[in-house]
């Protein structure tokens, strides 16, 4: 545990609550002190849903500390069982209440014997895993609970469907554009004549989990959540899974080709007919996807050689890096992820695409790296957007964690062929806005900006005289801050405190700026 004002991935119990509140008719009991109960407000604000989050807090107060939690926890479980009639109740502590070292598994076992609902304890180590890891493990635990029970009762139907079908695993509440991505994945599978068997956990029912093995394969669009469930289903039931994220034209083709191989494995047995998705890939790439045509346009060619920094979760950071380089000709100076647990996969994916790889969950390291590189644009999380504002570098948000403005009401998928179009817009506009500011500087306008000293400036303690400021204002806005920082670095190296026009001319001559 550490105290921080910014965390890329939240505490473990948030991941468990996200999975629980994604299922239909599942309730979560959170054993925690007041102050840990912000999930309900956060979900209601960001997802803008009509219903309250199905989460109840079992408060740890002075009475609990004096007498223990057993009676209170069981009472809350039975009360919610009577009031809500859920199919499943998930009991979870928080990292704070875990300090008490209470046997919550025992409480859950006792409550399950006297309640009508199923009750399970989210078996997560709150000191070792973060929000995303906990969500992945909780989803696997729920799926395993129902499949193991059905298998033990000999009621599990493992016969595959008559037509090609798939489970989509990993779509859940508060995910980055997850609702839009799910619609796009449904459209993709419908175009390929593949039936949707189940989507979990978002909108899924735990009663239907016993039908998961009937699908021909599993589709896991994000590595962060769903991969453990897919691996469990593969090990126990021999179900193949596709984990290539269908983001960008190149990876879209690779994902569909993997689906093609999985379908054709069972097609001769089930329908005596193989499928061919190559014409679909060719048609979508050449004639339907506007992003593919845009990548060959003169506007996109203007981005060739532009520098950028990419940072986010492993899935989105890796995909945006590859799209930037392969499909738009942008140079990625540094790419990184805060998913330290998935660092090996991340490095393997992008080692040939960028100059430097950064694996960290410390936002100050990311900020320092961006200040050193001084890219033309940033693609990251909400924190990188803040950093970009301080450095006057445009930033496109491509990954969680995000603020409410990245939960759009309109249709904005990142996956599928429509997703490639949506990604191209913020990528291109992030660079184009620099020229817009330059034109405003030249011709004037109501939002013309004055020169501002940035808090991340390299020249802390340096003094610019009025004449040197006027000289600096003649430099186009979209490169002005970069020139300013280079002049300040030059002055520091020479031991100069007062920056005059002579210092500017000397720096420009030496540095070629």
Swiss-Prot record:
An annotated Gene Ontology molecular function: oxidoreductase activity, acting on iron-sulfur proteins as donors
Pathway(s) served: Porphyrin-containing compound metabolism; chlorophyll biosynthesis (light-independent)
Name by which UniProt lists this protein: Light-independent protochlorophyllide reductase subunit B
Reactions listed under catalytic activity: chlorophyllide a + oxidized 2[4Fe-4S]-[ferredoxin] + 2 ADP + 2 phosphate = protochlorophyllide a + reduced 2[4Fe-4S]-[ferredoxin] + 2 ATP + 2 H2O
Active-site positions on this chain: 299 (proton donor)
A GO CC term assigned to this protein in UniProt: chloroplast
Group of enzyme by EC: oxidoreductase
Keywords recorded for this protein, A-Z: 4Fe-4S, ATP-binding, Chlorophyll biosynthesis, Chloroplast, Iron, Iron-sulfur, Metal-binding, Nucleotide-binding, Oxidoreductase, Photosynthesis, Plastid
Chief localization: plastid
Record: residues binding substrate: 434-435
Annotated cofactor note: Binds 1 [4Fe-4S] cluster per heterodimer. The cluster is bound at the heterodimer interface by residues from both subunits.
GO biological process: light-independent chlorophyll biosynthetic process; photosynthesis, dark reaction
Subcellular localization(s) per the UniProt record: Plastid, Chloroplast
Residues annotated to bind [4Fe-4S] cluster: 36
Magnesium is among the record's keywords: no
UniProt-listed CDD domains: Pchlide_reductase_B
Matching HAMAP family: ChlB_BchB
Family: Belongs to the ChlB/BchB/BchZ family.
Cofactor(s) listed in the protein's UniProt record: [4Fe-4S] cluster
């Amino acid at each position: 545990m550490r105290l921080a004002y910014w965390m890329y991935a939240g505490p473990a119990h948030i991941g468990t609550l996200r999975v629980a509140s994604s299922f239909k008719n599942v309730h979560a009991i959170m054993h925690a002190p007041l102050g840990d109960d912000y999930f309900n407000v956060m979900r209601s604000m960001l997802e803008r849903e009509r219903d309250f989050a199905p989460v109840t807090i079992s408060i740890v107060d002075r009475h609990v500390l004096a007498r223990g939690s057993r009676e209170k926890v069981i009472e809350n479980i039975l009360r919610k069982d009577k009031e809500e009639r859920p199919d499943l109740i998930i009991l979870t502590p928080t990292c704070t209440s875990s300090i008490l070292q209470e046997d919550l598994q025992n409480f859950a076992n006792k409550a399950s014997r006297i309640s009508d609902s199923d009750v399970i304890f989210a078996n997560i180590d709150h000191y070792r895993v973060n929000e995303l890891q906990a969500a992945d493990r909780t989803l696997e635990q729920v799926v395993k609970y129902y499949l193991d029970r059905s298998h033990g009762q000999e009621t599990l139907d493992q016969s595959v469907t008559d037509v090609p079908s798939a489970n989509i695993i990993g779509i859940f509440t508060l995910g980055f554009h997850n609702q839009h991505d799910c619609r796009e994945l449904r459209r993709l599978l419908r175009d390929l004549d593949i039936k949707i068997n189940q989507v979990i956990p978002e909108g899924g029912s735990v009663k239907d989990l016993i039908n998961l093995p009937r699908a021909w394969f599993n589709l896991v669009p994000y590595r962060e959540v769903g991969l453990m469930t897919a691996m469990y289903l593969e090990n126990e039931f021999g179900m193949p899974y596709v984990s290539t994220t269908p983001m960008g034209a190149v990876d879209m083709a690779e994902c569909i080709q993997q689906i093609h191989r999985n379908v054709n494995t069972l097609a001769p047995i089930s329908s005596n007919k193989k499928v061919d998705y190559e014409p679909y890939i060719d048609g979508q790439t050449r004639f339907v996807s506007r992003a593919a045509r845009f990548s060959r346009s003169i506007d996109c060619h203007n981005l060739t050689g532009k520098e950028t920094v990419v940072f986010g979760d492993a899935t989105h950071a890796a995909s945006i890096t590859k799209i930037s380089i392969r499909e738009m000709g942008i140079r990625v100076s540094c790419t990184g992820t805060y998913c330290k647990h998935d660092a090996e996969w991340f490095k393997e994916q992008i080692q040939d695409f960028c100059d430097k790889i950064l694996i960290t969950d410390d936002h100050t390291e990311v900020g320092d790296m961006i200040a050193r590189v001084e890219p033309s644009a940033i693609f990251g999380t909400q924190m990188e957007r803040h950093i970009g504002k301080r450095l006057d570098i445009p930033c496109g948000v491509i990954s969680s964690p995000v603020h409410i403005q990245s939960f759009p009401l309109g249709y904005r998928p990142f996956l599928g062929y429509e997703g490639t179009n949506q990604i191209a817009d913020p990528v291109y506009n992030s660079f184009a806005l620099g020229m817009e500011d330059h034109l405003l500087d030249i011709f004037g306008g109501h939002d013309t900006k004055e020169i501002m000293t940035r808090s991340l400036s390299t020249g802390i303690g340096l003094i610019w005289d009025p004449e040197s400021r006027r000289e600096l204002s003649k430099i186009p806005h979209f490169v002005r801050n970069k020139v300013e920082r280079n002049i300040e670095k030059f002055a520091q190296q020479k031991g100069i405190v007062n920056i005059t026009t002579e210092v500017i001319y000397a720096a420009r001559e030496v540095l070629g700026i």
